[in-house]
Structures are given as C-alpha cells and as structure tokens.
Amino acid sequence: MRNKITSVIAALGTAAIMSTTANAGTLDDVKKRGALRCVVSTGIAGFAYPDKSGVWKGFDIDFCRATAAAVLGDAKKIKAVTSTGKTRFTKLNSGEGDVLWRNTTITFSRDVGVKLRFHGVNYYDGQGFMVNKKLGVKSAKELGGASVCIQTGTTTELNLADYFHANGMKYEAVAIETNDEARQNYMSGRCDVYTTDASGLAATRSTFPDAQNHVILPEIISKEPLGPATRHGDDQWSDIVTWVYYATVTAEELGVTSANVDKMKSSKNPEILRMLGVEGNQGEELGLSKDWA
C-alpha cells in the first residue's frame, strides 16, 4: 500500500510539473519577449517582402501584425523569421518562430506527420506554370521535355510529377529553395518553366522588367488552400491564432476598420460589441485584453 501511495504522489508531482510547463506556453513567451516572431517566406511580392527601408510588408505580414496587435497591443512588435519551403516547419517546431504566417498549403501530412495545427484558409490558390512568350507554348500539355524550376519541400514537387506522368510527358527538374533563386534561374534561361502557386507566379512576374513577355498558362493543376499554422501542444496559443484570423474575417464582413473602430464601439449590433470587447469576456477567455480584436 505504501508503495502505491508513493507512486501516486510521484505521479501527481509529475503531472503538476507538466501542467506548469504547459501553462508557461507561447503566449507567455511572446509577452515576456515583447515581440511576435512570424515565420515568413524569404520574400514574395504582395505576400511578404521588405521595402527599401527594411520594413516587412504584404498579405502574410498584415496577418502577423494583426496577431501582434491582439497579443501585445502593438502591430509593430513583430520579427520576420525568414524561411524556405524546406526550413519553414523546422523553424516553427524548433521554437525559432511563434506562428507561421506564410504561403503554406494545408495538408494531412503536415497536420498529422509534421505536427502542425492549422487555423483556417486565408487564401485559396492552385499550382500553375509560367513561361516566356518566345517559347511559343499555349498550354501546360505542351511542356514535354521542358526544364522546370521547382521549390523543394513543397506540395508542388509531387503535383508536378503527377501531372506530367498523367499526361505522358517528361521534364527536367531544376531544384531551387527560394523564390528569388527561382526568379534568377528562370530569367537566366536555366529553366524553361517556373511552377508554383499561381499567386506566387503573378507576384514574381510583377517584379520582371519585361513582365509583358511572360505568360501564366491557363491550367491550374492543384488545389492549394493556404493558411497559418502553430505547433501542436499549445491549445491556448492555437485558439488565439485561430480567432485572430476569424476576427479579421468578421471585421471585414461587418465593416469594422482601424479607421472606424472607436465609433463602432457604440454600435447597436451585439456581434460587433462582443468582438470589440464592449460586451462579453472573449478576450479574457483567450488570455488577452478585452479589446484584443
């Protein structure tokens, strides 16, 4: 009996330690640090890129700033942790970043195998192909024998192999790690084709001095639902990222903006009042301030 009691006490002690560790999660780390670290790309126009002053801007960065505003009360308190397709998950899971706001496809293997928790789709995309007009190609089904620039560690690798196999074509893969590397190889002629999400192709083409000479082919060969991710095992932080995302969607639906938010606190719409913390205790339930949204 004594041994059983000792075992129970030891188990309770272990549980208490684990509970303390779990409670000291990402939210506490971010608050203590005073900055939110967002895992982003190395640079994609329109999504995440540093301007001439080194200030990061873009679609993904805006969501990163929204998260910082909710958690720290200041959208400027962010740090961009740049990553390639191969390193993004390692940087998140190792703790180098707090949240992944990066053009990343939600997949079964990334959720279950890589242990990522996804928090909704903030951009629906699909894989496409870009070629120089002088190649004379009108369809992806005419790309047999082409050299193709493709980022490693992405869903585009398997999609590309499947598409060419299904259409009885062969290709030469030119492996690259960053969008900038793809741009350089494509522009130099090292590869005939660049394939990635269609949004990424459009963003990359917009940076070309001769953008009008490059065409994105009509075929979209995959479904790429993009969304933010956090590590498994921190439910509170997962809830925060999830509801920061949904708060931005709801705010857009209800017409709440940074310019009219103070006026909206006098709204007669109870949904707006709850979102802005005038009524209810949603912020408290998340471990944030009443006006977190």
Language model features with spans:
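Sec-exported extracytoplasmic/periplasmic mature domains
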Residues: 31-35, 68-73, 93-97, 134, ...
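Bilobed "Venus flytrap"/periplasmic-binding protein-like clamshell domains
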Residues: 37-46, 56-72, 105-106, 125-181
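Cleavable N-terminal signal peptides
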Residues: 11-12, 22, 30
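Extracytoplasmic small-molecule ligand-binding "clamshell" domains
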Residues: 25, 31-101, 286
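Acidic, polar ligand-binding/catalytic clefts
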Residues: 65, 69, 73, 77-142, ...
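Extended ligand-binding regions for polar small-molecule ligands
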Residues: 62-65, 69-71, 133-137, 141, ...
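Bacterial N-terminal signal peptides that target proteins for export
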Residues: 1-9
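Sec/Tat signal peptide C-region and signal peptidase I cleavage site
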Residues: 17-24
